[in-house]
Regions:
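Short gly/pro/ser/thr-enriched loop/turn and capping motifs at secondary-structure boundaries
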Residues: 10-15, 81-83, 111, 140-141
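Short glycine/threonine-rich loop-to-helix capping motif typified by GTGT followed
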Residues: 113-118, 144-151, 183-191
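Accessory alpha-helical/coil subdomains and C-terminal extensions
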Residues: 3, 24-133
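Phosphate-binding loop/pocket of nucleotide- and phosphate-handling active sites
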Residues: 171-208
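Acidic/polar active-site rim loop that often engages polyanionic ligands
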Residues: 7-20, 43-44, 69
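Catalytic, metal-anchored helix/loop core of enzyme active sites in primary metabolism
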Residues: 139-154, 161-165
Length: 208
């Protein structure tokens, strides 16, 4: 048999056995930069923007980028917010004096509707805002790797080679609690990394 050590690479950050995957932090920075630019036009034109990011099965990008970019609401697959609750939250924002808002939507959010259907529902029930949709799409998969990703890739690469030389195989390199670790491949592909519930709580607090 051929010895194999895997290294996790996906922007979705949804692989079990590692806290971070290669590409995730770069995608976060790309998304936050885009939302910051969208915020500029939203603020100057009284607009409500729905920004769709990748994450059909996991909301890591939407949740962390949404918090980092100061989004008013975040819709992710792991939490069923519901359109009525979203509408009420945006109404509260409007009454508090906000002239613009950003809603970050993971492409697999729990509403069962796509971002254009969600935006249409809100626009029909919240006429104050001029509603717009921005789908960031595949730009999230490109770009120059962040410093964090470069350093992590180097650490994982060195550890992977050393693990092979020590006779290990059929395992995946990961990072857990700042330590580089090994997880059996069959265990790594069996499940998905979970959203940090404390981040959901932080998001809920910041949206008030």
């Amino acid at each position: 048999s051929f010895p194999v050590i895997g290294i996790p690479g996906t922007i979705d950050n949804d692989i079990q056995g590692t806290r971070f995957t290669l590409g995730y932090d770069t995608a976060l920075n790309t998304v936050i930069d885009a939302i910051d630019k969208i915020r500029d036009t939203a603020s100057s034109h009284n607009r409500l923007f729905f920004v769709e990011v990748m994450g059909r099965d996991a909301g890591h990008i939407a949740l962390n980028a949404g918090i980092g970019a100061g989004a008013e609401e975040i819709l992710i697959p792991e939490e069923d917010m519901g359109l009525e609750r979203l509408l009420e939250s945006l109404k509260r924002s409007e009454k508090s004096g906000k002239t613009s808002s950003i809603v970050v939507v993971a492409e697999g959010d729990k509403t069962g509707k796509n971002v254009f259907e969600i935006a249409s529902y809100i626009e029909n029930n919240l006429p104050y805002y001029e509603v717009r949709v921005s789908v960031l799409g595949h730009m999230q998969r490109g770009g120059t790797p962040s410093c964090f990703v470069r350093a992590l890739a180097s650490r994982m690469g060195v550890f992977a080679v050393e693990s092979l030389l020590e006779g290990n195989s059929n395992k995946m390199v990961g990072i857990i609690d700042e330590n580089i670790t090994l997880t059996p491949l069959e265990e790594a592909i069996k499940g998905k990394s979970r959203i940090n519930n404390n981040l959901i709580r932080v998001s809920d607090i910041l949206s008030i």
